[in-house]
Swiss-Prot record:
InterPro entries: UPF0253. Transmembrane segments: none annotated. NCBIfam families: PRK04964.1. It comes from Escherichia coli O45:K1 (strain S88 / ExPEC). This is UPF0253 protein YaeP. It holds the Pfam family UPF0253. Belongs to the UPF0253 family.
Length: 66
């Protein structure tokens, strides 16, 4: 957990304690958010590219590993 930012560690603690809901389909949750980020014109092109690249890698790994 040390390598993740404070906000991620905070949300992790909230989910682990039951204060925040757990999403069983974690991959689907991540892909939904990355897709929203990649499509958001309000974000910088660099951030959108990072989101798109991460999502594409997850999709490839999900299909390749099945």
């Amino acid at each position: 957990m040390e390598k993740y930012c404070e906000l991620i560690r905070k949300r992790y603690a909230e989910i682990a304690s039951g204060d925040l809901g757990y999403v069983p389909d974690a991959l689907g949750c991540v892909l939904k958010v990355l897709n929203e980020m990649a499509a958001d014109d309000a974000l910088s092109e660099a951030v959108r590219e990072k989101a798109a690249y991460a999502a594409a890698n997850l999709l490839v790994s999900d299909y390749v590993n099945k």
